[in-house]
UniProtKB/Swiss-Prot annotation:
Keywords: Disulfide bond, Knottin, Protease inhibitor, Serine protease inhibitor. InterPro entries: Tryp_inh. Belongs to the Mirabilis serine proteinase inhibitor family. Disulfide bonds join C5-C21, C12-C25, C20-C36. This is Trypsin inhibitor 1. The lineage of its organism: Eukaryota, Viridiplantae, Streptophyta, Embryophyta, Tracheophyta. Pfam families: Tryp_inh. GO terms for molecular function: serine-type endopeptidase inhibitor activity. The keyword Disulfide bond applies. The presence of a 'disulfide through disulfide knot' structurally defines this protein as a knottin. The record marks R32, I33 as: Reactive bond for trypsin. It comes from Mirabilis jalapa (Garden four-o'clock). The keyword Disulfide bond applies. It comes from the Eukaryota.
Amino acid sequence: EDEECAKTDQICPPNAPNYCCSGSCVPHPRLRIFVCA
């Protein structure tokens, strides 16, 4: 169940920081989405 993590700037679920390799999902500066830090 250990899937590949999302790289920087990939879209991520706001409530799932561990979805990202960095463990950080942040709001995109311009778009109304969340991306991995």
